Amino acid sequence: MSSEEPPIKKQKLELSDPDEPLTQHDVISFQKEALFRCLNSKRVELEALTKQYSTVHDKWEQNVHTLATLMSVLSTAASHLRGLCNEESEKTLCDEMINAGESVDKERTDEFLNLLRKYTNSNGSSDSKIDSLGLELQRANKTKSELRLQNKKLTDEIDSLKAYYHGLVRSYDREDSMTVKRVFNKQKTDDNTDNISNTEQRPTSVSPVLTNGATHVKNEVKTEQEALNNHTDSSQSSGITEEEKKKLFLQYENKITDLESHNSSLNRIIEELENYKQLNEKELAQTRLEISNLLSEKHSNEEEREDLLHQIEKLKASNTDLTLTNESFLSKFQELAKEKDTFQEKISSDFEKTLESLKAQNLALEKDLVRVRTTRDELISKVAILEAETSKSVLISDLKQALDILRDQWEKIEFRNNQSPSSDALLKEIQDLESAFKELSSLTHKKYSEYLNHESVISKLTIEKTKADQKYFASMRSKDSILVENKNLSKSLNKANELILQLKDTDKLYKQKIESLHKQLALSQNNEKRLVDSNKAANLKVMNLNSEIQKQKKLLDFTSSQKNELINELTEANGMLKSKELEIEFKENELQTALKKNEKLEEFLSKENYNMNKPSSLATTNLDEDSMAEELENFRTLVYCSLCSKNWKNMAIRTCGHVFCEDCCKERLAARMRKCPTCNKPFSSNDLLMVHL
């Protein structure tokens, strides 16, 4: 935002002379800049959290997509398995898994897996494969736990890195602040060469322990605030002479020069720690890349390693250039932050003005909305009354039309009776029709009167309902206005409570800062020892990482061998599938031949019936009655159903190939007798096939 906005020059702070004692204005400006630095750090943390949230949200969407695909696969498997089930409980379990969605119970999934194993074992799969898969699952869980521990270690290191960089940014902000320099009486001097040379004699090849880097920054703050307290105490004391004041001033100046030299040496150590940390990060990245390449290539060449080492050296050189550019960007960032303060003040004032105008507009709109709602309710009640009246008129017109039609029909019948010769039968029919017509008309009149009464009751109720609705809406509008007033009052009360809490928090923070300054004095003496210990710990970490890399390589080789075994098992399963498909084709061919035989037998039967009907063939048929009876019985056994011996065979079972009639098959399915009566093989409704003989 600050790069796109026009640069606004910040007003220069009016600080007192450094030779004079501190004033109240200096302390207030110092506190304001400290608050600004705190707000800026919180803003940076918020931006980082938003980025993390976006990445986590994308991963969540991917997981939802994969879960949906897995659930679709599970539902298809359950629907296929439902046809093989014989018991009702198993079918209900399959239906639950089909309609489960994303909420699946663990106990029900275990039952479904047991059912799946039951039917897969019946189809010919072996238990050895299941045991091998279970062992592989245990190994995968073991590797998962190891990776989880590594993830914890890496997250701890990342947290320490974040804390370290936050401390660095805070120290840079404090160094560039004019109020900090004024309060702690910092001046740019070049008399610190002796102290810097003493600090350079210390060991520089220390490890990048991030917590110790942060304590250096804290020591700087601690010494500066101690000097401020001592300076204010000395200036406020009344019984001190001018000579003693000068001596104290010289002592403070000497302390400040010592602290500045110590600060410069600490900054150099921090830079060396940063370089060493970045080198370690690059080496870790390179090792991770090598591990990922080992998944595709088992043996790596020495030439590639040498190239990687050259690339690391080039990256080191580019890293030094980037540190210089980073420092220049930090200075620019601080200038832009100062300009941003003034711009934000202007924006806040404009925002308050626009907010007040919008509140006034909102009140006017709320009044208009109440007026529109009242008119709307009145119109709705009128429309309901009109609709009730129109429905009555339509029904009356329909009844009149029905009566007119009946009268026309009656006149036509009378006219026909007058033209035709009179007879007793017709007179009786006419009398019956007349009596029926009278009964019908009386019934219609009764129904019509009942309907009118019902409609009048409904119209009264609708009118009362509209009145009640109007009262309800009026009460709701009054309730909304009361709720708005309550919200405004609660907001004002919350703001007052927040101000009280903020004042209490500031008091607590000042007390905590004083206590932390006393504690940091003791910690500053042990910084050098901690740096040496941290160097040793970092070397041990590097050794552990190398050992872990070798373990990961071994795990990769083991997983590749397991992968090959699984591929072999898959090929065997595909071969079994192909053999089953060939068996199905053979069964279909047999079925087609049986159908052809049935067609030939039908033709033969039709010919025999034709010959039986001829008079010349009666003599010959009497001779061959026994043979024909046998042939007819054989034909019936082939064509008619063997269960009922009434219907034709028109339904075949796919699992075994036996043929029965459709009625018998449906009766057996309805009675839950789902086994073939000839071979006792199980079948379902999906295994039935229509056959046309």
Swiss-Prot record:
- The protein's superkingdom reads Eukaryota
Entry-linked InterPro entries: E3_ubiquit_lig_Bre1, Znf_RING, Znf_RING/FYVE/PHD
Q: Does the keyword Glycoprotein apply?
A: no
Q: Name one GO molecular function term.
A: ubiquitin protein ligase activity
* Main localization of the protein described in the UniProt heading: nucleus
Q: What EC number(s) are associated with this protein in UniProt?
A: 2.3.2.27
Q: Which keywords are on file for this protein?
A: Chromatin regulator, Coiled coil, Metal-binding, Nucleus, Transferase, Ubl conjugation pathway, Zinc, Zinc-finger
What pathway is it annotated to?
A: Protein modification; protein ubiquitination
Q: Which reaction does it catalyse?
A: S-ubiquitinyl-[E2 ubiquitin-conjugating enzyme]-L-cysteine + [acceptor protein]-L-lysine = [E2 ubiquitin-conjugating enzyme]-L-cysteine + N(6)-ubiquitinyl-[acceptor protein]-L-lysine
Q: Where in the cell is it found?
A: Nucleus
Region entry Disordered, spans = 1-20, 185-210
In residue numbers, where are the RING-type zinc fingers?
641-680
Q: Which residue stretches does the UniProt record annotate as biased composition, category Polar residues?
A: 194-210
CDD domains the record matches = RING-HC_Bre1-like
User: For this UniProt entry, what's an example GO CC term?
Assistant: nucleus
Family according to the record:
Belongs to the BRE1 family.
Q: Tell me, in a sentence or two, what this protein's role is.
A: E3 ubiquitin-protein ligase that mediates monoubiquitination of histone H2B to form H2BK123ub1. H2BK123ub1 gives a specific tag for epigenetic transcriptional activation and is also a prerequisite for H3K4me and H3K79me formation.
The name this protein goes by in its record: E3 ubiquitin-protein ligase BRE1
Its source organism is: Candida glabrata (strain ATCC 2001 / BCRC 20586 / JCM 3761 / NBRC 0622 / NRRL Y-65 / CBS 138) (Yeast)
